[in-house]
């Protein structure tokens, strides 16, 4: 395919997305440029909505289900409201790859009919619109994963019988639970970057500051949910791709350990690579929404349908135990302990991130919890291991899928195109090195029992999600803050904290990080002004119930302190 032809094919696909939006929902007047209007959330997008649509779309997933499962709100009304707001969101920041609003409204009508006939909801997600990253196959809906060469194919394969008929396991389970599926969101081609850019929709911008990135690779999910065009959605994460967009868009997002949420039947990059597995998790404006979706999916027993899913049901007893620890801490009878890592020894953080961590630390101290400085095994080792995983095939996967159309590669994309694939022996050695690093980190975590004062190791770790807030395009410096979690296969959540403020977040040119001087440190307070700032809550492997419970508790407390210090 020539340069002109792949561009035309991408443009045609881009136009088809807009054409799928009903005319009544298309913006008649052009949106002011980002230099004149950075923030298109809240009042800006609300001007195109009715009061009823605003009420529905600014309600979180838990409260929506409380309404739809009792018949107070119809599934159709809720679905139409989110379809409208999603259509607006796409026209503001380029966040959608696929819209199937008509099919969604048809499904919602069937749900309303079911409720009218049976006086009971279909499932725990009855009537809840759920958005999906464009890796999940949905019947009669295309999956491009950002590749021009995947348009009108099944994962790049022409005349594949699965085209239009295949559904990912998670999609099947969401339907069983009563969720209404209505759109798929933008991703970067290859998935290998902390920004979202491809040759179909171009760049997905940050709704709070349209001069900045929405993150990646689940950047479309982050942007859509930030604009409340979705109450909750599912992304994937191999190096930070759930947590980065969540943090960049002032949202919660969980990266669970591998095997808890079914990946069966989803498209992927580097498919078959198993040294560091990509995982699926939800993104939402509230921690309790994550818990709702996570618990609901596990209730479908995914281990019966996905050979890599663990037979590990939702553990209410862990939630209860964690809540008891929280109550004891409130009463002064006991305390929780947290590590705080402000700098990983590789990428010094910008002032908004440093301030966000100070807010978190002060919140923990106000609540009476123990806080210790985190001194783990070298994170540079984890970054090196992850880099080897990303380049394991020497760029074969990347070159093949870009080569289907001959399209150009975005400069942000990680990975080599001209490497040598690793041999079986080299992959084995990499797996051993990863295991040894995991053991070192495990031993260090255990050793913190000697300094917490609780007799236990730390309950969780707080650290940055990235060196910066929502980033300037093509300036994402390091995935080290999120990537080490993937190497360890730990549970991790993004928690929103505050927003960058050019009047507050300033720094002298000679200021050091943890007493060390660093040569490279680029920060422009004006450019980052208004950018969302999130932090990362990290737990040990398979601690999803505990971390979600802590996130719900601490997220509210952190938000309170951030508001008081604003």
Functional labels for PLM-detected ranges:
Residues 42-52, 126-152, 211, 327-341, ...:
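Short helix-loop capping/hinge segments that flank enzyme active sites or metal/cofactor-binding pockets
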Residues 71, 127, 133, 176, ...:
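Glycine-rich, small-residue loops and helix-cap segments
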Residues 142-161, 350-351, 470-476:
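Glycine/threonine-rich flexible loop motifs
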């Amino acid at each position: 395919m020539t340069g002109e032809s792949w561009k035309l094919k991408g443009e045609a696909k881009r136009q088809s997305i807009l054409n799928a939006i009903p005319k009544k929902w298309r913006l008649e007047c052009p949106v002011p440029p980002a230099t004149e209007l950075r923030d298109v959330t809240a009042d800006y997008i609300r001007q195109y909505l009715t009061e009823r649509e605003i009420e529905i779309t600014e309600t979180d997933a838990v409260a929506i289900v409380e309404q739809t499962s009792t018949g107070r709100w119809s599934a159709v009304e809720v679905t139409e409201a989110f379809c409208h707001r999603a259509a607006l969101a796409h026209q503001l920041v380029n966040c959608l790859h696929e819209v199937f609003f008509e099919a969604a409204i048809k499904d919602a009508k069937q749900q309303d009919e079911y409720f009218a006939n049976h006086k009971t909801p279909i499932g725990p997600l009855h009537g809840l619109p759920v958005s999906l990253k464009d890796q999940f196959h949905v019947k009669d809906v295309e999956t491009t994963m950002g590749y021009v060469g995947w348009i009108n194919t099944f994962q790049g394969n022409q005349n594949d019988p699965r085209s239009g008929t295949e559904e990912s396991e998670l999609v099947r389970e969401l339907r069983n639970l009563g969720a209404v599926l209505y759109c798929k969101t933008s991703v970067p081609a290859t998935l290998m970057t902390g920004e979202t850019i491809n040759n179909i929709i171009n760049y997905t911008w940050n709704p709070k500051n349209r001069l900045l990135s929405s993150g990646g690779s689940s950047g479309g999910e982050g942007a859509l949910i930030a604009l409340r065009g979705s109450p909750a959605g599912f992304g994937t994460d191999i190096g930070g791709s759930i947590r980065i967009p969540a943090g960049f868009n002032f949202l919660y997002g969980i990266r669970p350990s591998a095997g808890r949420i079914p990946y069966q039947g989803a498209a992927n990059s580097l498919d078959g690579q198993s040294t560091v597995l990509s995982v699926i998790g939800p993104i939402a404006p509230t921690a309790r929404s994550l818990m709702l979706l996570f618990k609901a999916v596990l209730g479908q027993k995914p281990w019966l349908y996905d050979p890599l899913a663990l037979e590990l049901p939702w553990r209410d007893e862990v939630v209860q135990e964690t809540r008891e620890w929280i109550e004891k801490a409130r009463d002064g009878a006991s305390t929780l302990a947290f590590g705080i890592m402000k700098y990983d020894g590789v990428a010094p953080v910008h002032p908004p991130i440093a301030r966000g961590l100070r807010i978190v630390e002060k919140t923990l101290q106000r609540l009476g919890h123990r806080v210790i400085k985190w001194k783990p095994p070298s994170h540079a080792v984890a970054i090196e291991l992850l880099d080897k995983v990303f380049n394991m095939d020497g760029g074969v996967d990347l070159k093949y899928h870009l080569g289907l159309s001959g399209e150009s590669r975005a400069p942000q994309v990680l990975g080599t195109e001209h490497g040598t694939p690793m041999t079986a022996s080299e992959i084995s050695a990499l797996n051993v090195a990863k295991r040894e690093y995991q053991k070192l980190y495990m031993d260090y975590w255990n050793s913190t029992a000697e300094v917490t004062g609780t007799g236990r190791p730390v309950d969780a770790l707080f650290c940055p999600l990235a060196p910066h807030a929502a980033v300037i395009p093509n300036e994402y410096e390091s995935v080290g803050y999120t990537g080490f979690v993937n190497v360890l296969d730990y549970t991790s959540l993004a928690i929103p904290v505050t927003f960058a403020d050019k009047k507050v977040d300033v720094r002298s040119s000679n200021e050091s990080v943890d007493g060390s001087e660093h040569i490279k440190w680029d920060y422009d307070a004006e450019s980052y002004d208004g950018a969302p700032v999130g932090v990362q809550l990290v737990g040990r492997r398979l601690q999803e119930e505990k971390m979600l419970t802590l996130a719900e508790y601490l997220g509210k407390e952190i938000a309170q302190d951030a508001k008081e210090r604003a």
